[in-house]
């Protein structure tokens, strides 16, 4: 994984964890959890691509990997919509910058996962 992507994930997760959004903090914690899960999934998919021979074991280990991939894309779309919504409603510039960076990162990761999945197909 690109070291800039790693630091971007870590930076955004750290910033999001510092935000105080009142009653919606439970939603924010859910977003943080999904961000972390997405990062781990992206890493494992990227590693499988790097070891192209691992495709066979990936399919054996997880016969439903396409279904899982579809689920991850749904999660990404949900996160993108949630981040866009937060971006529209927040007036705090720190939060706006954080959500803008999170949105950009999500779009980049979505593209990377698409690229990885096409290489695996």
From Swiss-Prot:
Keyword Transcription among UniProt keywords: no
Protein's cellular compartments: Virion; Host nucleus
Motif (Nuclear export signal): 12-21, 85-94
GO cellular component: host cell nucleus; virion component
Keyword Transferase assigned: no
Main location: virion
InterPro entries: Flu_NS2
Keywords: Host nucleus, Host-virus interaction, Transport, Virion
Pfam family, one: Flu_NS2
BP terms from Gene Ontology: exit of virus from host cell nucleus through nuclear pore
Tree of life domain: Viruses
Reported function: Mediates the nuclear export of encapsidated genomic RNAs (ribonucleoproteins, RNPs). Acts as an adapter between viral RNPs complexes and the nuclear export machinery of the cell. Possesses no intrinsic RNA-binding activity, but includes a C-terminal M1-binding domain. This domain is believed to allow recognition of RNPs bound to the protein M1.
Other remarks on this protein: Average number present in a viral particle is estimated to be 130-200 molecules.
Family: Belongs to the influenza viruses NEP family.
Subunit structure, as described in the record: Interacts with protein M1. May interact with host nucleoporin RAB/HRB and exportin XPO1/CRM1.
Protein name: Nuclear export protein
Species of provenance: Influenza A virus (strain A/Chicken/Hong Kong/YU562/2001 H5N1 genotype B)
